[in-house]
Amino acid sequence: MYLISLYFDEKTNRLLQRYIDKIAQQTGNTFMTEHQVPPHMTVSAVEARSAEQLRPAFEDLCGRLSQGRIRFVSIGQLLPYVMYVTPVLNEYLQELSRSVYDAMGDLPETRVSNYYRPFSWLPHVTMGKTLSKEQMAVAFGVLQEVFVPF
């Protein structure tokens, strides 16, 4: 499985990392910090036998993709184990999703995950993962206290 992900400017990254760290500290679940998972937003997940199969599509995408503005407005849960922050699904993100899918979707011997197809993708940045039911409640409380749309 190969993932295509967005990474953020330094200011956004610091803020998202603070949320991740606070959840780890308050819940005792250190999956994100122990595995050094940086704040990121996965745009696509592609099954392929090798990276070489994807190289032409990646090279094509590199010339067409650009930076954009994202506004994070809410928190959420992917039950039963994940806490996240989510942006507005604006034109930039919608177009990005479509462009990546168009580049990867028809490659021979590959498959784009159903969760990352246009109009079925839920853009989010994971703040906590592998959380128990109790840890989810604590993580939700943490984000209720510290999260402000930005």
Feature-to-residue mapping (PLM):
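Basic, often amphipathic N-terminal segments
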Residues: M1-R69, E91-P149
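Short, low-order "capping/linker" segments at domain edges
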Residues: V82-Q94
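Long, low-complexity, Ser/Thr/Gly/Pro-rich intrinsically disordered segments that act as flexible linkers
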Residues: G76-Q77
